[in-house]
C-alpha cells in the first residue's frame, strides 16, 4: 500500500470495536492533534492534554508513558487521518492529472480542517534538527508521502497525461514545494489570493510535464 497506511495492528486500534480505554485514548489523540496543529507538536504534553480533555494526568500517563510516546502516537493518528482523507480518496479518482488534482484538493481541505494547518509541515520545522524517535517517525512519514507523489507522477505517465521522460523525483519536489508555499501564504500571510495563485502555479507545473 502507499504512504501513511498503518499496519494491521495500528489500524485495528483506531477503528470499530474499541474498548472504553481505547475510546478514551482516541479522544486524547484527537485533542492532541488539534493542539499540535495550533501550538506545535513540541508543545503537546501529557499535562496540558490532561487539562484540555479533563482527564487525570496519571490516567494519560498510563496510556502513553512519556511525552515522546504521546507525540509519536499523535503523528501516527495524524497519518491515519491523512491517509483516509487525502490519499485513499485520490486513488479512487481516474489516474493521471485528475488524480493529481484530487490529491491536491484533498490535501488543502485536510489542512483547512486543522486549526493550525498541516501538522506535518509544522512538526518538520520543529524536529528537523532534533535527532530522536519523533524525528525518525516524522522522517519516515515524509519519505512515504514523497514516494506517493512519485508514484502518482508515474501513473500519469502510464495513462499518457505526462511525457515518458519525466523525472518523478523532480515532480515530487515541485509539487510538494507548491503545497508548502500554499501553506505559508494561506496560514501565515493570510493572502486572499492564495488559492488563485496556487491554481496558476499548478497549471504551469502540470503543463511542464506534459
Model-predicted regions and their roles:
Residues 166-185, 201-205:
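Hydrophobic alpha-helical segments that form the core
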Residues 38-41, 62, 163:
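Helix-turn-helix/winged-helix DNA-binding modules
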Residues 26-34, 38, 51-52, 69-92, ...:
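Alpha-helical structural segments
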Residues 136-140, 158-174:
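All-alpha amphipathic helical-bundle segments outside canonical DNA-binding/catalytic cores
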Residues 1-39, 43-55, 69:
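Basic, helix-initiating cap at the start of DNA-binding domains
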Residues 112-133:
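Amphipathic alpha-helical segments used for helix-helix packing
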Residues 53-64:
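Short hydrophobic/aromatic patch on the recognition helix
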Residues 1-18, 102-106, 110, 146-159, ...:
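C-terminal peripheral helix-coil segments that are non-catalytic and often amphipathic
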Amino acid at each position: 500500500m502507499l504512504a501513511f497506511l498503518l499496519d494491521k495492528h495500528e489500524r485495528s486500534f483506531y477503528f470499530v470495536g474499541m474498548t472504553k480505554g481505547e475510546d478514551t485514548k482516541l479522544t486524547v489523540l484527537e485533542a492532541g492533534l488539534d493542539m499540535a496543529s495550533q501550538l506545535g507538536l513540541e508543545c503537546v504534553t501529557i499535562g496540558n492534554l490532561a487539562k484540555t480533555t479533563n482527564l487525570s494526568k496519571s490516567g494519560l500517563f498510563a496510556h502513553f508513558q512519556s511525552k515522546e510516546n504521546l507525540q509519536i502516537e499523535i503523528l501516527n493518528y495524524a497519518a491515519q487521518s491523512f491517509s483516509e482523507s487525502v490519499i485513499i480518496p485520490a486513488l479512487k479518482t481516474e489516474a493521471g492529472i485528475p488524480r493529481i488534482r484530487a490529491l491536491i484538493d484533498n490535501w488543502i481541505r485536510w489542512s483547512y480542517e486543522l486549526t493550525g494547518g498541516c501538522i506535518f509541515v509544522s512538526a518538520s520545522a520543529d524536529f528537523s534538527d532534533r535527532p530522536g524517535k519523533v524525528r525518525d517517525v516524522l522522517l519516515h512519514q515524509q519519505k512515504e508521502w514523497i514516494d506517493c507523489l512519485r508514484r502518482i507522477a508515474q501513473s500519469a505517465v502510464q495513462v499518457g497525461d505526462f511525457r515518458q521522460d519525466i523525472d518523478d523525483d523532480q515532480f515530487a519536489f515541485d509539487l510538494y514545494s507548491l503545497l508548502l508555499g500554499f501553506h505559508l501564504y494561506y496560514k501565515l500571510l493570510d493572502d486572499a489570493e492564495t488559492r488563485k495563485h496556487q491554481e496558476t502555479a499548478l497549471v504551469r507545473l502540470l503543463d511542464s510535464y506534459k
